[in-house]
Amino acid sequence: MSTNIKIIKKVLNGYVGFANLPKQWHRKSIRRGFSLNIMAIGESGLGKATLINTLFNRDIITSQHDSDEFDEGEEEDVSVKIKSTQAEIEEDGVKLKVSVITAPGFGESINNVEAWKPIVDEINSRFDSYLEAESRINRTAVVDNRVHAFLYFIEPTGHSLRALDIALMKQVHEKVNLIPVIAKSDTLTDEEILEFKHRILADISHQGIKIFKPTDFEYDEEESANTRSIIDSFPFAVVGSTNEVQTPDGRLVRGRKYPWGVIEVDNENHNDFVKLRQLLVRNFLEELKEHTANVLYENYRTEKLKRMGIEQDNTVFREFDPAAKQEEERALHEAKLAKMEAEMKSVFQQKVSEKEKKLQRSEADLFARHKEMKDKLTKQIKLLEEKKAQLEKQKLLPQDPPAQPAPQKSRKGFLR
């Protein structure tokens, strides 16, 4: 087949109508709505729920939703739980479906060596469910639940990244659009924030961690300058607050009030919240989704199919092989069954472990009750033996003879 395609350019003599395509796309997008899946990860108390609510200017999640739920007596076995919250919000007729995934319990255990594993499993599970839906014959109802943006909240220590931070980011940086965030930056001075940013970026570069950077369109100077400003602000030092406070000049702003002054959430001179909002929502929401679909998901899909023994070359784009397609579907089905089996085994092992712990607690209670009853019985036996000894001792002592009754005097005048 010849690849030399001759393109003939002609000037149209009349209005055809394809110049109306952007309007068609706009109407379709408004009718269909948009979606955004955000994973917000970090230790408890770093203001994840507050920042998400500040981003969308409404209560998407509550602080209780992200609280750590574990027994006080088992703090050494804190487990990471995955929680998801969905909300549909509307602004000027445009609908946005927001899904926020959090991981309460992350970093709260004594041993955090594999604290990242449930988070990575959740990301992979979402890729797998999308791959499964995409492989069906009827794909009209494919729901995109893949993670579009991964906000990692860094504790504002002012030093450098911890081993846990590096371990998690190295596990997820090739699966998600990683966006590091310095939480509660109002606890640091401007100089400390600048130095902290340099150390974080140095650690990220040294570890080979990839973070999401928006595309710089050089042909648009204003847009390019805005993009470079966003990139230069990495990692974002943010402050979140949904409360309004009054500034010294009388303005009502979203922010936090301190004895030394007011820090404004929406003021770029105070923190990087505005730049984070531009990256996530205002300017690059669709780019985040496209990069997830065209790069991150495709890389995951290719690697997964290779592990399953399915090789793909350029011939699939030139012809359709039903046998190969059937083999691919069979392999995907087997992978799905294997995944379900692994999940069932995991649930079974978890239930067995919980049952064993319950039996161990019951056994300990029974031992304690047995010991208590044995101690009581021993005390009763000892008490009875003491009483028996006292009785035997009393028998051995000499007893006084019984008193003789006094002789009765005979009455005179009567015969006896």
UniProtKB/Swiss-Prot annotation:
Region G4 motif: list its residue ranges. 183-186
In residue numbers, the region (G1 motif) covers 42-49
Q: Which ranges form a coiled coil? A: 323-399
Q: Where is the Septin-type G domain?
A: 32-307
Q: Tell me yes or no: is Secreted among this UniProt entry's keywords.
A: no
Q: Which amino acid positions bind GTP, per UniProt?
A: 42-49, 79, 105, 184-192, 240, 256
**Where is this gene product found?**
Bud neck
Q: Which PROSITE patterns match?
A: G_SEPTIN
**Alphabetical list of Gene3D superfamilies matching this protein:** P-loop containing nucleotide triphosphate hydrolases
Quick one: where is this thing mainly located? other
What Gene Ontology terms describe where this protein resides (cellular component)? ascospore wall; Gin4 complex; mating projection base; prospore membrane; septin complex; septin filament array
Return the annotated region ranges for Disordered: 392-416
G3 motif: region residues: 102-105
What GO MF annotations does this protein's record show?
Answer: GTP binding; phosphatidylinositol-4-phosphate binding; phosphatidylinositol-5-phosphate binding; structural constituent of cytoskeleton
Entry's Gene Ontology BP terms: mitotic cytokinesis; septin ring assembly; septin ring disassembly
Keywords associated with the record: Cell cycle, Cell division, Coiled coil, GTP-binding, Nucleotide-binding
Nucleotide-binding recorded as keyword:
yes
Q: What does this protein do?
A: Plays a role in the cell cycle. Involved in the formation of the ring of filaments in the neck region at the mother-bud junction during mitosis.
Family that this chain belongs to: Belongs to the TRAFAC class TrmE-Era-EngA-EngB-Septin-like GTPase superfamily. Septin GTPase family.
List the PANTHER family.
SEPTIN
Q: What is this protein called?
A: Cell division control protein 3
What is the originating organism of this protein?
Candida albicans
Gene symbol of the encoding locus:
CDC3
